[in-house]
Amino acid sequence: MFMIIGLQVGFSSNSEEGKKEIADTIFVNGKVYTVEKQQPWAEAVAISNGKIIYVGNNTCAKAYKGNKTKVIDLKGKMMLPGFIDNHLHASGTANLLFTVQLKGAQTLEEYVQRVKAYDEQHPGATVIQGHGWSNTIFPSASPNKAALDAVVNDIPVALRSEDFHSLWVNSKALEIAGITKDTPNPEGGVIERNQDGEPSGTLRETAQNLVLNTLPSFSVNEYKEALHYFQSFANKNGYTQVKHILVENQENIVQALTALEKEQALTIRHNLTFAIQPSEGESRIPYLKEQRNNLQGQLVKGNGAKLFMDGVM
């Protein structure tokens, strides 16, 4: 399958009347799926200055050829319009680059050993964060703080589940967050507890924020690096636009994206949706209006809000 990233898709008339714009690149002999009712399939595409100026047949595409035009023979391969992902957490790539990776481990022991190894490799760390544990590894119970306390008990450990809806923490993280047996469940969240009522070490949904809000956020530069990494992946897989769901560290993420836009380092469109926690309610509206007004660039736009009202199964 052959994919191309295009910034604008349109159809040019097949008429040869008038002067044609000269293309930088022309693709011919392809199976081009256009997603247009009047012409769902084509065999040629012409591009000039990063924009698609013609979609149609091989013969008419020749009218856009100049002395320096590059012609690429697709040899029957498929070409698709750019993909749009309407719900993702691209900034979460920072978790992939800068924290303990638990994905792929098959047992509790493997999880714990990865945390222990990270602690040994980062002797100056003030916190250990990680991502990727699966609820399926704990079929009869939730992750417990005791397993983490056995390897790291002097600094907080906070490990996100693979779906980002649960947080596994050690006793130090609970202590710093002030979570005790008397702490009530926050609206929209659950503090799981042992039989004696003490927090067990698993926080579900909005209860995660009780610990996450006490941890240092990724820096603007770390988010810039993470977004570069994400864009590289997106480009290779044919994505031209994404909708970010921003939950925590919104300011740093916005600063990273706007800085990259000013540096002309963005290669896809980024639409931003800001999450609102149940406890925030209408107090968040002025902030959302401000972001909508400020974020109206060519490649970065603030145009949505996410109301968090449920959980996952």
Question: Which residues does each predicted region cover?
Answer:
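Bacterial N-terminal signal peptides
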Residues: M1-Q8
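Divalent metal-binding segments
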Residues: F11, G18-V28, Y33, K37-Y287, ...
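Accessory "access/gating" subregions that flank catalytic or transport cores
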Residues: N293-Q296
